[in-house]
């Protein structure tokens, strides 16, 4: 609890004028789901009271809806490709003033120092960054990360560095089976939250996962999964990101049964969509369009995530809360016409106010993180196999981070070569295989964003030039110090440099978004790619904790059985 502020109390009593009076609006009261015609009196950063009173500044919103600001229930900053200050500049105009962030991408590259560097950079910004302690670094033993965290590191992040809980427990087999190390990481949360990650986990397995102390899940893809979780008291974060778009499949249960134990999250969001469509307000718009009443949408987008994550200063506009206020001339647009953060106007008309967000210097340890040793050649990335050979292939599912374990004949339509190159210690370790679902006809796509260990992942066409283009793409990433590239005919067609841990840019959000658009356009044009977000999909084919089949620097992994499998059948 924050210490009482005598100035706020004086304004609340009416003894002193408010610093700001927002009048003429309808204030949303989450507890009663009412719209109350009243004014908000703000003292400094805090809502001091409701009702008309003297104030140094008055803003008449002309009948607008006044709501708490949006909170993202679960996200990874690194997936936006933006450094922390640019992310805040991007989302404030859309009404988001708080996130629950799991920086396990940074942790996989740089360990605890990467996490604490992010915390320090975010602290001065006009934003609430709730940072969780990554629990599974590396995500599994099947891949080579740049760092490893055990229960002592997790505990230190919570107890010494202010992490607000333990982040998603991706090693759900370990938790369910009672692995002592995983249970020790869970226990490190103490009285704070322990987030989950349980794709496809149901029945007794889910019972065990919950009995261990896990409290939430954002991996539901089917309504039946979400219903079972809520029935058993588990929070469900309904995800609508760039690759995983699960809201349409899950929101009907909220329409039918109400919003209890549910909240909205983005998980992984690309910068182009972030600037174009919005952030949590985009999720809110989709939920409302699916039939969720506006009042319940606000619970999902504002109040519930704030309550779950312990953001007690956010989530409603009662006296004593932080004055993170959104004004909607038309609530149905879900685009706020004004955004106040801690009592200060930070955006109006969808545009950030000048000087609203200070620069956050980039720590030097985030640069120079791509270490390949000798750059692998075409033969190392794409071993020759005879046409007609039966092989396993990672089957990409558009708009999902799940994959299929495909068994195909080499040479079939819509196949691509695939490889993952270790990039943290220059070991030269390369895992090779095949992928389907990209529609790749020519060239190669490569990325140092490769969940969760973030090695170099590359796919190349099955034609004679594919291996050469794969080698060119990997070499270019080494030159850039990280990023994403499209190569065709031995030349770079487009690229997005990501020099910060190989995950994020140091450039303005609009520039990064434009580069991402150009990269996707090159992939769809010159290379023939048919899926909507090819680089987001590419980044997930190495994720060795979500079924079914994945490729890592150690080869193919069958996640259903948690074991390595050979390429050839």
Residue ranges and their predicted role:
Residues 1-38, 42-43, 51, 92-94, ...:
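Active-site microenvironment of metallo-dependent hydrolases
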Residues 2-11, 88-193, 257, 492-495:
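Divalent-metal coordination cores built from histidine and acidic residues
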Residues 21, 69-71, 131, 264, ...:
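Residue-level marker for buried hydrophobic side chains located in beta-strands
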Residues 53-56, 61-121, 464:
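Metal-associated gating/positioning segment near the N- to mid-region
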Residues 110-114, 140-146, 177-181, 205-209, ...:
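Short acidic, glycine/serine/threonine-rich loops at helix termini
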Residues 148-167, 174-238, 244-264, 275-289, ...:
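Histidine/acidic residue-rich metal-binding segments in metalloenzymes
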């Amino acid at each position: 609890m924050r210490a009482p502020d005598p100035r706020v109390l004086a304004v609340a009593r009416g003894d002193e004028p408010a610093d700001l009076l927002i009048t003429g609006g309808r204030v949303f009261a989450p507890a009663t789901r009412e719209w109350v015609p009243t004014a908000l009196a703000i003292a400094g950063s805090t809502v001091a009271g409701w009702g008309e009173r003297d104030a140094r500044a008055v803003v008449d919103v002309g009948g607008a809806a006044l709501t708490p600001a949006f909170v993202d229930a679960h996200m990874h900053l690194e997936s936006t490709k933006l450094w922390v200050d640019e992310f805040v500049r991007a989302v404030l105009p859309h009404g988001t003033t708080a996130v629950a962030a799991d920086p396990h991408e940074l942790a996989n590259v740089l360990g605890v120092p990467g996490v604490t560097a992010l915390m320090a950079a975010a602290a001065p910004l006009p934003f609430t960054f709730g940072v969780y302690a990554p629990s599974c670094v590396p995500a599994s033993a099947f891949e080579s990360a740049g760092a490893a965290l055990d229960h002592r590191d997790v505990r230190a992040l919570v107890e010494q560095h202010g992490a607000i809980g333990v982040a998603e427990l991706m090693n759900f087999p370990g938790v369910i089976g009672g692995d002592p190390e995983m249970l020790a990481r869970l226990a490190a949360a103490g009285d704070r939250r322990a987030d989950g990650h349980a794709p496809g986990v149901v029945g007794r397995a889910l019972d065990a996962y919950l009995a261990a102390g896990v409290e939430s899940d954002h991996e539901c893809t089917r309504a039946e999964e979400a219903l079972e979780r809520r029935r058993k008291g588990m929070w469900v974060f309904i995800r609508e990101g760039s690759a995983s778009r699960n809201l349409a499949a899950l929101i009907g249960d909220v329409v039918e049964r109400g919003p209890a134990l549910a909240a909205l999250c983005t998980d992984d969001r690309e910068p182009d969509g972030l600037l174009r469509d919005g952030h949590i307000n985009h999720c809110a718009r989709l939920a409302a369009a699916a039939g969720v009443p506006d009042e319940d949408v606000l619970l999902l987008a504002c109040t519930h995530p704030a309550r779950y994550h312990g953001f007690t200063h956010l989530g409603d506009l009662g006296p004593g809360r932080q004055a993170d206020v959104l004004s909607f001339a038309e609530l149905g647009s879900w685009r706020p016409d004004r955004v106040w953060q801690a009592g200060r106007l930070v955006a109006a008309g969808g545009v950030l106010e000048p000087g609203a967000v200070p620069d956050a210097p980039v720590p030097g340890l985030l640069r120079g993180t791509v270490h390949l040793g000798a750059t692998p050649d075409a033969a190392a990335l794409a071993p020759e196999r005879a046409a007609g050979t039966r092989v396993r292939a990672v089957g990409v599912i558009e708009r999902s981070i799940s994959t299929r374990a495909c068994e195909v004949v080499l040479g079939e339509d819509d196949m691509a070569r695939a490889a993952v190159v270790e990039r943290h210690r220059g070991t030269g370790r390369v895992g090779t295989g095949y992928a389907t679902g990209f529609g790749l006809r020519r060239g190669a796509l490569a990325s140092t964003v490769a969940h969760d260990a973030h090695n170099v992942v590359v796919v190349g066409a099955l034609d004679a030039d594919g291996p050469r283009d794969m080698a060119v793409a990997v070499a270019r990433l080494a030159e850039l110090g990280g990023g994403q590239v499209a190569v065709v005919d031995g030349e770079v067609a487009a690229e997005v440099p990501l020099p910060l841990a190989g995950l994020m840019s140091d450039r303005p959000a609009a520039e990064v978004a434009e580069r991402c658009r150009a990269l996707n356009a090159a992939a769809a044009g010159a290379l023939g790619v048919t899926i909507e977000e090819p680089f987001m999909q590419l980044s997930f084919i190495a994720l060795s904790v979500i079924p079914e089949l994945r490729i890592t620097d150690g080869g193919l992994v069958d996640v259903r059985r948690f074991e390595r499998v050979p390429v050839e059948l």
